[in-house]
């Protein structure tokens, strides 16, 4: 049973060793009672202790004289400390090795350290395992000449400075280190953990940084030891393995990041270098360093030239180095790297980290005996420049294949025979002129393996000469650099650049791509989305500025941060290296998403990526990394889109199909809910069950207007406001102030991708007949398939739902200036528009839901069309695009009832002044017809049709009632009429005398829209008729009975065409079964007939829309054409 023994006095750092005195003698020497020992027993031994002290004092003077003589006779002048022969004292290293009585090592084995910073301090309590163990106390004396310090006492501020003599720790520690190598240069020692502990204390005890040369040498010694021994040495000296591999301590015990470091002096470094002459693993390296030290080449002379000259010099010297060898060494097999080097295989060790839980040896995948088994199939996952490759940066010419030949005893560890071809060189920053170095400690059995590796590296390097390129990370070859880049980004790229827009989680492989993406004001590019597994860890790490809270190391967790909604990502399972208990795994797995500089370092290290002391040493607390993260605020002109959680899709939507591996390697685009990619624009009109979607009027809520919505650069609120929909009645009057197509560019980006390939507004009216005609079919929404149903319920029409359109009253003048831009009269048209809007009676009826209730809920997550609820407003928008797209876009000009499935078509129609000329002027007030002549309407209509089609075909359509007018003209005639609803509003109330005058105005308005849009006969003959019919159904001003009957009769055109089961060509009167066949007929047979001048009374026709528009917009060509009012 172990007994407690009190510590020595605090003014002396002492060690235990086997000797002739017992435990009571040691306690009596310090006059300290021991637990369980009678104090009277200590007094009985007092006389013997006095005799021992007197003998020790008498022998001290001869010993110092011998030390002085040895120092004067030493040929090495750099040795400033006193040395003793091995026979001088039996406590030197030369005699301790075989007996295994190293005091430093045995003390560290038996003493639990109370503080990592004062390992060699005086506050320790040895636990004796055997009651009869014989101990002796020996002080570490100062070896400097004329210093009478008997025992090293660590300083309160600097542990390496003795409080008694003010000399350093190295001057005292040499008292216990062997100098046998100075007298027997041909002999080498076996590397043992106790000896390495003593030598390591010279450079690690009380310091916070390690000189590079000493670290190179100490790494060689550590490579021979077991990992448990290495960890014990480091922890005993106040270092963690992570700090040692880094080369300096990043954070102190309190967690503070250090900005200054204590390091041993240059004189102490020279003294310590001599200790490495004792081992064959380091002897040749030290000899070369000594030669360079004497020649003065170890210190690089500062250059007065610029950095470019320095870079040119270094690059010119590096041309002799084999790139293939460097690439192979950077990505060599982990088994060829020592276990203490394999742990930090990324740049994360250069930055602050957090300790989570101490990781035990079984969790790290260590075998029971501490050996690291070789795994040839595993490779490093990152080509990062870390400390582990410090020794491998040398060319083939620098590696000397001649091993150091010496008598080597059997090794204690099998890892000694797994050493790699390592150059014994200093880093270039210490000695850039160094070009060659010998290699030591290579067995003869390694030559075949080394030659095979070099041959393989040469074979890999020759791949580039064949036109192929190989990946530096895994060695695979590819046809070209583009394929290699895709492979590298997908497999090996861990350093990514995140978009600076808040809420956008896009990551890019280059700053150039990231900056180009961040500068794009299009909010669609910055929408949050779920990414593939490769980017989940980055999204999780960047979800907050502060360090996220860890719920469990292995369970799923949610990272939260203030000011941002939680990201519902779950942590992937731990690396298989950590979960597999087999001893064949590596010590630690490769770190992921590690950034090379603090502003980009956001990754949270897993427990397997930590290095914690196995003992009960205090570890650094969790330090928030927010101080090292630079948040780049977005420019004021860039939108700040709030993050929207897209964790679940709507119930009816399936997951989007997986992308190809090549596509997933690039920055991931927005993953939307499932979207029908078919040509919905061409097929939407084919649905016979769709009700009339041409809305009479639309009222815009002024409170929802946003000037930010109007500017493409300030479309901040696009995603929060434009998702709201309005349940509006057929009788609502829409405001005339609207946005032009150019103002809708940010919103237009949400259109189907098929529209993105179509020409812009400025080009659409002049070029691209195919695009123009294919979009005309999107303009007017159909309702011809249900004429009977629509006429049967004149007073109970279902409410039409239209997506809210955002306008701003301040944009009225800009809107009119756009009209003037296309027609050459901005100021006059603005004045006309002002007078026109002042003459209108704007009404804002209450908005109704499909059930007839007021739409009082402003929740943007509910579809007011079908009353479905969604997870987010973004899901609602996708739902509208996929389901209710036909009900969204109505012409923004008051009085025009054309509706379109896309904003682009609607905006192009709204911006055409010729289609709304008579709606924007008061000339219609002067044209009136006698109210007693209701039958004049048909005659005028026939005359009008004769003027249009007189030279092309006769009016011989006697078989059909009122079917002589083409669809476009019929649409104009029927515009504004349909059913009689007493509560409905007039479309245009410009009359003051009679309703017939109003009807004349309305008919004149319809006549101006005879074409409805460019080339309406090409793709929208059915659309025009449906538009007219649905307009009639949706608009019903109060008219005299006779006029209403006349209008009802005119509806039979579309009714007959729909009831006959086919669609008639209005030019050759052939019947076709579906609209698709009719469209093909128009394109192939009547292409020239399609582009007729849109000015009523002008019979000019053109082969292209561009020519027709140029003709139609020229008012000088239509001066002699009188306006005709048709009833």
Curated annotation (Swiss-Prot):
Cross-link Glycyl lysine isopeptide (Lys-Gly) (interchain with G-Cter in SUMO2), where in sequence: 305, 424, 444, 449, 669, 922, 947
Cellular localisation: Nucleus
Keywords carried by this UniProt record: Isopeptide bond, Metal-binding, Nucleus, Phosphoprotein, Repeat, Transcription, Transcription regulation, Ubl conjugation, Zinc, Zinc-finger
Record's compositionally biased regions (Polar residues): 403-422
Tissue distribution of the protein: Highly expressed in ovary, testis and kidney. Expressed at moderate levels in skin and small intestine, and at lower levels in lung. Trace amounts of expression detected in liver and colon. Not detected in brain, spleen or thymus.
GO biological process, one term: tongue development
Listed Pfam families: zf-C2H2, zf-met
InterPro entries in alphabetical order: Disconnected-like, Znf_C2H2_type
Amino acid composition bias (Low complexity), ranges on this chain: 389-400
CC per GO annotation: chromatin; fibrillar center; nuclear body; nucleus
Zinc finger annotations (C2H2-type) as residue ranges: 469-492, 861-884, 1063-1086, 1091-1118
Molecular-function GO term, any one: DNA binding
PROSITE patterns tied to this protein: ZINC_FINGER_C2H2_1, ZINC_FINGER_C2H2_2
Biased composition (Acidic residues): 676-689, 1010-1023
Primary location recorded for the protein, binned into one broad class: nucleus
Renumbered residue ranges of the record's region Disordered: 44-67, 386-450, 675-772, 955-976, 996-1041, 1107-1127
Biased composition (Basic and acidic residues): 49-67, 698-708, 747-772
Function, in words: Probable transcription factor specific for skin keratinocytes. May play a role in the differentiation of spermatozoa and oocytes. May also play an important role in early urinary-tract development.
Protein name per Swiss-Prot or TrEMBL: Zinc finger protein basonuclin-2
């Amino acid at each position: 049973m172990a007994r407690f023994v009190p510590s020595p006095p605090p003014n002396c750092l002492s060690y235990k060793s086997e000797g002739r005195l017992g435990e009571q003698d040691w306690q009596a020497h310090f006059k300290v009672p021991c637990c369980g020992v009678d104090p009277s027993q200590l007094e009985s031994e007092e006389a013997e202790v006095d005799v021992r002290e007197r003998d020790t004092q008498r022998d001290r003077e001869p010993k110092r004289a011998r030390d002085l003589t040895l120092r004067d006779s030493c040929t090495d002048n750099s040795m400033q400390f006193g040395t003793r022969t091995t026979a001088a004292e039996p406590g030197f290293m030369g005699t301790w090795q075989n007996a295994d009585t190293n005091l430093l090592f045995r003390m560290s084995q038996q003493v639990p350290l109370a503080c990592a910073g004062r390992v060699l301090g005086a506050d320790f309590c040895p636990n004796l395992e055997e009651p009869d163990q014989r101990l002796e106390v020996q002080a570490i004396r100062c070896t400097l000449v004329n210093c009478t310090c008997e025992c090293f006492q660590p300083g309160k501020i600097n542990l390496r400075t003795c409080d008694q003599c003010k000399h350093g720790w190295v001057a005292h520690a040499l008292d216990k280190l062997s100098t046998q190598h100075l007298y027997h240069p041909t002999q080498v020692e076996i590397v043992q953990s106790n000896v390495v502990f003593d030598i390591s204390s010279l450079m690690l005890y009380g310091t916070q940084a390690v000189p590079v040369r000493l670290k190179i040498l100490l790494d060689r010694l550590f490579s021979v030891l077991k990992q448990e021994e290495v960890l014990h040495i480091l922890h005993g000296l106040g270092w963690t393995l992570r700090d040692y591999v880094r080369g300096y301590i990043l954070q102190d015990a309190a967690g503070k990041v250090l900005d200054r470091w204590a390091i041993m002096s240059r004189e102490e470094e020279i003294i310590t270098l001599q200790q490495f002459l004792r081992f064959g693993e380091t002897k040749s390296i030290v000899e070369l360093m000594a030669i360079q030290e004497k020649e003065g080449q170890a210190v690089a002379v500062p250059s007065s030239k610029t950095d470019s000259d320095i870079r040119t010099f270094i690059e010119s010297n590096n041309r002799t180095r084999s790139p293939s060898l460097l690439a192979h060494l950077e990505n060599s097999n982990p088994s060829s790297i020592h276990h203490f080097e394999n742990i930090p295989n990324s740049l994360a060790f250069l930055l602050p980290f957090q300790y989570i839980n101490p990781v035990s040896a079984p969790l790290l995948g260590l075998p029971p005996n501490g050996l690291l088994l070789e795994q040839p199939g595993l490779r490093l996952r990152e080509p990062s420049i870390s400390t582990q490759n410090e020794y491998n940066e040398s060319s083939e010419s620098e590696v000397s294949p001649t091993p150091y030949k010496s008598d080597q005893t059997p090794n204690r560890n099998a890892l000694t025979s797994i050493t790699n071809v390592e150059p014994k060189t200093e880093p270039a920053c210490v000695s850039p002129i160094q070009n060659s170095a010998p290699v030591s400690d290579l067995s003869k059995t390694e030559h075949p393996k080394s030659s095979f590796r070099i041959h393989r590296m040469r074979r890999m390097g020759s791949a580039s000469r064949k036109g192929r390129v190989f990946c530096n990370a895994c060695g695979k070859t590819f046809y070209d650099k583009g394929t290699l880049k895709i492979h590298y980004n997908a497999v090996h790229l861990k350093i990514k650049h995140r978009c600076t827009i808040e809420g956008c989680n896009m990551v890019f492989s280059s700053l150039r791509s990231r900056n180009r993406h961040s500068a794009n004001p299009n909010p669609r590019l910055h929408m949050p989305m779920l990414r593939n597994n490769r980017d989940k860890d980055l999204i999780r790490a960047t979800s907050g500025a502060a360090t996220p809270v860890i719920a469990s190391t292995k369970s799923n967790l949610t990272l939260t941060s203030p000011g941002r909604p939680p990201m519902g990502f779950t942590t992937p399972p731990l690396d298989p290296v950590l979960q597999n208990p087999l001893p064949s795994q590596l010590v630690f797995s490769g770190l992921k998403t590690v950034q090379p500089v603090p502003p980009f370092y956001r990754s949270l290290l897993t427990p397997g990526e930590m290095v914690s002391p196995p003992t009960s040493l205090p570890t650094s607390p969790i330090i928030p990394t927010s101080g090292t993260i630079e948040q780049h605020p977005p420019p004021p002109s860039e939108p700040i889109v709030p993050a929207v959680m897209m964790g679940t899709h709507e119930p009816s939507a399936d997951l989007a199909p997986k992308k190809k591996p090549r596509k997933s390697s690039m920055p991931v685009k927005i993953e939307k809910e499932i979207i029908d990619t078919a040509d919905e624009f061409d097929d939407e009109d084919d649905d016979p069950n769709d009700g009339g979607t041409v809305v009479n009027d639309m009222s815009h809520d002024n409170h929802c207007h946003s000037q930010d919505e109007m500017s493409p650069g300030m479309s901040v609120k696009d995603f929060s406001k434009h998702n709201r929909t309005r349940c509006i009645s057929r009788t609502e009057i829409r405001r005339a102030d609207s946005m032009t197509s150019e103002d809708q560019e940010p919103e237009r980006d949400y259109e189907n991708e098929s529209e993105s390939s179509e020409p812009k507004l400025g080009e659409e009216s002049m070029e691209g007949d195919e695009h123009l005609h294919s979009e005309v079919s999107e303009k007017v929404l159909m309702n011809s398939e249900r004429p009977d149903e629509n006429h049967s319920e004149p007073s109970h029409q279902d409410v039409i739902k239209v997506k809210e359109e955002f306008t701003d009253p301040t944009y009225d003048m800009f809107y009119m200036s756009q009209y003037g831009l296309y027609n050459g009269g901005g100021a006059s048209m603005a004045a006309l528009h002002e007078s026109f809007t002042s003459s209108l009676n704007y009404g804002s009826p209450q908005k109704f839901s499909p059930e007839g209730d007021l739409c009082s809920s402003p929740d943007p997550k509910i579809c007011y069309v079908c009353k479905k609820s969604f997870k987010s407003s973004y899901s609602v928008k996708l739902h509208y695009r996929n389901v209710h797209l036909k009900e969204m876009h109505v012409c923004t000009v008051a009085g025009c009832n054309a509706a379109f499935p896309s904003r682009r078509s609607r905006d192009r129609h709204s911006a055409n002044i010729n289609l709304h000329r008579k709606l924007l002027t008061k000339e219609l007030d002067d044209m009136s017809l006698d109210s007693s002549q209701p039958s004049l309407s048909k005659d005028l209509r026939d005359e009008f049709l004769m003027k249009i089609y007189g030279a092309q075909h006769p009016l011989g359509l006697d078989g059909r009632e009122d079917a002589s007018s083409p669809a476009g003209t019929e649409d104009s005639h029927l515009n504004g009429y349909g059913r009689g609803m007493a509560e409905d509003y007039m479309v245009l109330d410009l009359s003051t005398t009679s309703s017939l005058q109003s009807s004349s105005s309305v008919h004149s308005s319809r006549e101006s829209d005879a074409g409805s849009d460019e080339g309406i006969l090409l793709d929208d003959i059915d659309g025009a008729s449906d538009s007219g019919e649905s307009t009639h159904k949706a608009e019903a001003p109060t008219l005299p009975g006779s006029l209403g009957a006349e209008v009802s009769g005119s509806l039979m055109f579309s009714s007959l065409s729909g009831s006959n089961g086919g669609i008639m060509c209005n030019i050759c009167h052939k019947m076709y079964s579906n609209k698709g066949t009719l469209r093909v007929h128009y394109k192939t047979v009547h292409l020239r007939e399609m582009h007729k001048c849109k000015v009523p009374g002008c019979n000019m026709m053109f082969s292209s829309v561009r020519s027709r528009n140029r003709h139609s917009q020229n008012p000088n060509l239509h001066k002699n054409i009188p306006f005709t009012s048709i009833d």
